Amino acid sequence: MWAMSGALRPWALILARSPGARTYAGGGGVSYTQGQSPEPRTREYFYYVDHQGQLFLDDSRMKNFTTCFKDPQFLVMFFSRLRPNRSGRYEAYFPFLSLCGRERNFLRCEDRPVVFTHLLAAGPAPQRLSYCGGGEALAVPFEPARLLPLATNGRLYHPAPERAGGVGLVRSALAFELSACFEYAPGAPELPSHVRWQGRRFALTMDLAPLLLAAPPP
């Protein structure tokens, strides 16, 4: 169990074990019950992260700010243990897995499992991008030259931890702020070619494109 999630995990367990708990049947023929125990002393839970970086129980009927998980400790524990799902269970529908002892926490995502939500305040140290509500504890160095604007969906991407797929989505509000720093080549208004950041001009490397485009859709 998540040792620190006293307010959150009991709620999830009550939901899963209550007489009203239901088996969820999603697309692709997948079905599960929150808190199911496929083998002794093992529990399985199922989650979903949206394009804003909000984490929900996957079978929540309403997915909004009110129903998402907000406890920073829980979010840090969950996302810091995130790995590709190679468990042999639900791999096609839940491509990522966060393990806590004998508890399996499966994750699917609207776009990417890592969603950058905030650019942390500048200081003497290099700037960092924080993701999925984890503050300083879930952050990577900000690399402006490696920002990837994708014309096919109008979204912005940035390098993420390799264990979480190597590419993260930038939340729309933050992407809008960063887009003011882009420069476009003459006659090519679709995609920027450079970014200006803190008085410097960087050519966009676009090196994330092969990794992102090669990934199967979630």
From Swiss-Prot:
Q: Which family does it belong to?
A: Belongs to the UPF0598 family.
Taxonomic source organism: Bos taurus (Bovine)
Name by which UniProt lists this protein: UPF0598 protein C8orf82 homolog
- What disulfide bonds does the UniProt entry report for this chain? none
Q: Which InterPro entries match?
A: DUF4505 (IPR028108)
